[in-house]
Amino acid sequence: MKKFLFISAATLCISFPTFAGDYLTNTNQNAAFLRMIARGASIDIDGVYSNPAGLSFLSHEGFYLSLTGQSAYQTREIDANFPLFKQADGTNSSRLYKGTASAPFIPSFQGLYKKDNWVISASFAITGGGGKASFSNGLPMFDALAMGMITKQTDGQVTPQMYDINTSMDGKQYIYGVQLGLSYKINDWLSVFAGGRMNYFTGGYEGYLKTELKNDYTQIGQMMGLPDGKTLASIDLDCKQTGWGITPIIGADLKFNKLNIGLKYEFKANLNLENITEKMDLINVDRKYLADYEDGVNTPSDIPSMFSAAIGYEILPTLRASVEYHFFDDKHAGMANVTLPDGTSVAKQKTLKHGTHEYLAGMEWDITKRLTVSSGFQKTNYGLSNDFQTDTSFSCDSYSLGFGARVNLTQAWSIDVAYFWTHYNKYTKETDSYNGTGLKGSDIYNRTNKVFGLSLNYKF
């Protein structure tokens, strides 16, 4: 019986790395992006990230500085349907699991110095992740695996209503990016850029799993040989991760009177995350099943290459519009391995149908010399598959809306303020062996997202 406990408890844990190993590339590094979204052809201070080659076309020589603060809030929902949930709850076979991810303050800084045809620029930002996600009531994969394995190994004699499963998991991830580069205006219509970004990852996950017989059934636990008569399995884990990598960046900007074209390519950054395991307390669990969480173990988590192309056009002296395209080559960025339904193990990126495509558009209007209003739209398609999606790491195709304003306080000082909202398309994953239990089940994944941003800009 104890052998069964080892196997089931280990199965519950093998998906933990996918939570910390997956991340988002943050393109919102300035409130100007939040209020207009399509900023890849902008010639402004936020171009340090969105269009660095275009900085050479800035009219003012000297220093430009921008300090940004953003506040982001997300929810993640899993509507799980599994037949054993009905036995445990006595109601129906579905359960709703909800997690929250918040980042009250996401800072970023952008600065540059322009002299003649040359511009040197630098930035600091949280270029990936940026918050903490908490699932206080655990995840369906943990509950379903425990129920399925216990039912199978005891031939149904130990049923879900005889024990409690308590799980909780917190995960956090931050990728701090420091960027430095040079822009040069070759002639009146062409400028180029070369630079790089140093990425430092820090994050990890902390959680526990406890499966215990209820008080009315402790006698059964004693017959099973459980030390305290009730604990089937227990895991208490605290694992931190760190890693770093370099992203080379090149860009070009082509300016033809009212038309401007911005191009940028960010190369893949090879990133390996190293475990710093501070706690691994186990009861009825063989340590070898948690070998991936031992101190010093490395997991691939590359930052994918990215290509952006944008076209901006000045319709009127006071009205401008832009369209933009992004491609993230996720299929060639190393990720942790996942186990397929047939039992084989493959690198997670290979399960994607294609890399990420993003389509962006935006407009801004100078109502007066002091006030500019703007809005934008973004559509994101990830190329998701059932094998890529897990409870601990899932994404949903989406569209986003942003709007806001710039207030020119003086010739030197200005403020950008914006709100950014995302609608996600629900993703339904159905399987004949729900989380390896041999029973049919399904998950419906959904998310929400909203971001507030404020940037203070200064030039001299």
Where do the protein language model's features map onto the residues?
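Outer-membrane beta-barrel porins/channels
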Residues: 21-38, 43, 106-108, 112-460
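Sec-dependent N-terminal signal peptides
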Residues: 4-14
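N-terminal, post-signal peptide beta-strand-biased segments of exported outer-membrane/organellar beta-barrel
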Residues: 16-126, 394, 420
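Hydrophobic alpha-helical membrane-insertion segments
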Residues: 11-12, 60, 197, 326
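Residues in and immediately flanking transmembrane alpha helices
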Residues: 15-16, 64, 210, 382
